[in-house]
Amino acid sequence: MTVQIITIDGPSGSGKGTLAAKLAAYYQFHLLDSGALYRLLGLSLHKHDLLEKLDSHLDECVNYARQLNIKFETSAEGTLVFLDGEDVTQTIRTERVGEYASKVAAIPELRQALFERQRAFAQTPGLVADGRDMATSIFPEANAKIYLTASAESRAERRVKQLQGMGLDAKINDILANIQARDKRDMEREVAPLKPAGDAYIIDSSELTIDQVFKLMVDYVNSRTVSN
C-alpha cells in the first residue's frame, strides 16, 4: 500500500507545528516533527558538553545522533517528548534549545545521521512531516508539499505569546533578533538550505488565522488526491 505523504516546510514560528498536528488528526496520519529531533539532539549534545565541540568531536556527536534515546507519547494535552526518559516537552520549545537545533542542523554529518530516522516515520496510512527540508531533502516524493511562511515580525509576536503562555519571560526585540538570525543561518547553510520545493504550495500566514490557513491546506491536499 502506498504511503501518502504531506510535507510542511517553512521558517521558525510560521505555525508549522500547530497546523501539521491538525492535518495529521484530520487525515488520521502519522506525524513527524523533525524540528523536535534536531532540538532533542542539540539538547543532548549540550548536556554532554559536546555542542561547542562539534568540529573537534564530530564522530562522537554523530554517534549520539544515531543512538538518540527519544520517545514521543500522545496524551490529552498533546504530544509529550522524552529524552533519556525525562519529559522535555517544554524544555525543547525554549529559544535556547532552538539555537542548539539551528547549530546542529548546519552540520551535514548530523543531518545525514538523522535522515533515515526521519524516513522511518513514513508508514501507512500516511504521514504529515513538519520541518525545514521535508520536501526538498527527506520526502521529495511527497504527494502534497506545502511551504508555510510569515513575516519575521508576525512570527516574533506569535512566539512571544506562546512563551508567555508557557509562563516564560519573552521580549519581542530579543525574539525578533533570534528569528532573523535563525532565518539567515537556515537559508544560507550549505546542505539542505531552507527554501520551498519547486512544486510547493506557498502560503503566507502573516495576516491569516490558523483556521484560514488550515482550510487552504486541506483544499490543496485534497486536490493532490489525498482523500479524507
From Swiss-Prot:
One Pfam assignment: Cytidylate_kin
Compartment list: Cytoplasm
Keywords: ATP-binding, Cytoplasm, Kinase, Nucleotide-binding, Transferase
Catalytic activity line of the entry: CMP + ATP = CDP + ADP; dCMP + ATP = dCDP + ADP
Key word Transferase present: yes
GO terms for cellular component: cytosol
Top class in the EC scheme: transferase
Family annotation (InterPro entries): Cytidylate_kin, Cytidylate_kinase_dom, P-loop_NTPase
Known EC number: 2.7.4.25
Protein residues bound to ATP: 10-18
A biological-process GO annotation: nucleobase-containing small molecule interconversion
GO molecular function: ATP binding; CMP kinase activity; dCMP kinase activity
Similarity annotation: Belongs to the cytidylate kinase family. Type 1 subfamily.
NCBIfam families attached to this UniProt entry: cmk
Full protein name: Cytidylate kinase
Species whose genome carries this gene: Acinetobacter baumannii (strain SDF)
